[in-house]
Amino acid sequence: MRALVVGGGVAGAASAVALRKVGAEVTVVEAYEEPGGEVGSFLSLAGNGLRALSALGCAEAVAARGFEVPRQRMWGGSGRLLGDVPRGRLSGDPRNSVTLMRGHLVEELRAAAVRAGAEIVTGRRVGPETITAEAAGADLVVGADGIWSVTRRTLAGEAPEPRYAGIYTVSGVSERVPGDVAADPGVFNMVFTRHGAFIHITAPGGEVWWSAQVCSPEEPADTSLESVKELHRLDGAPSAVLGAAVRLHRPTLHHVLAEVPVWQDGRTVLLGDAAHPVGAGQGASMAVEDAVVLARAVREEDSVAAALVRYDRERRARVAKMARAASANRDAKTAGPVGRRVNELIMPIFFRHFYERATGWLYAEDLSEALKAS
């Protein structure tokens, strides 16, 4: 079977590895010459994503490119601790969440794909007028080309288009942050501020990786560091971290996508952000899960068409539930003064008594054995 993968980011590279493991001939076409390296900001891989990477044989190599983050702490704008829970895992899971640069995850997945025998062609942009020619001769076409997916528009002309979600992110790295702020390496700190949420994590070497997620009903005209410093000048830890910034990543506007009604047509299939941008710290993990589930279906079903029907059936409900969780996550960040006060009253109760029950469905997913030979 010949497979064409459109997009060589996390979803595309993971798909290439997974499909090679079940015997497909795989070609990946990627618009950018080098989508790895320092491109993009940092991301987290939760327990479910790391187990999916284990199915690809990549978990250890990927983990080595980042650092473990065992705990997550939520803070109110006043400095009150709202919750202290395991980060991206259930308390009984011995494998900690891993944080790393997005580009380094892509590098590891692409290297694994090449070692497995996939061909990766970079610098080739696929457009609506060229995708048919690119796909000629392929038995399976995988649309892993992100939230602005050309494949999605080609597959279903009436597919929804992304819209701005009312949040943008400015992120970077700080050095020599005051000790009381940077005291605990490996803790994912999320501070709910007057303007959204501010995340900071102290890496093993003492650098602080940070991300300011700022609410703005309209697309912002100014995403500079100075503008973000001004927004957070009264915010304690965020202000201290921003004041020590030494590197910035490219700012990002967050977009949402209404449910895509058509994921596949018997030959072409969407996965990752092309099908369901979820955010909420699960974008990469969900993309890797998609890749593993798709490859398992290809191996076990009698035809590509049957495999794609099964993939759609097995992924829809989980992804829809994740999308609802992501929406609730955004709502917490965009709450007004009254909403923030209510959240500060409710969150300590939730994290103390209900967190594990509420997240068990997400973090307990185990695809680590999904591609083992039967």
What are these model-derived regions, one by one?
Residues A3-V5, V26:
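Conserved hydrophobic helix-helix packing surfaces used for dimerization/oligomerization
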Residues G8-K21, V29, V142-G143, L248-A332:
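Conserved mid-domain beta->alpha element of the FAD-binding
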Residues A11, E34, W148:
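Conserved Rossmann-like nucleotide-cofactor binding loop
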Residues S149, T169-S171, G196-I199, A275-H276:
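Histidine-centered metal-chelating micro-motifs
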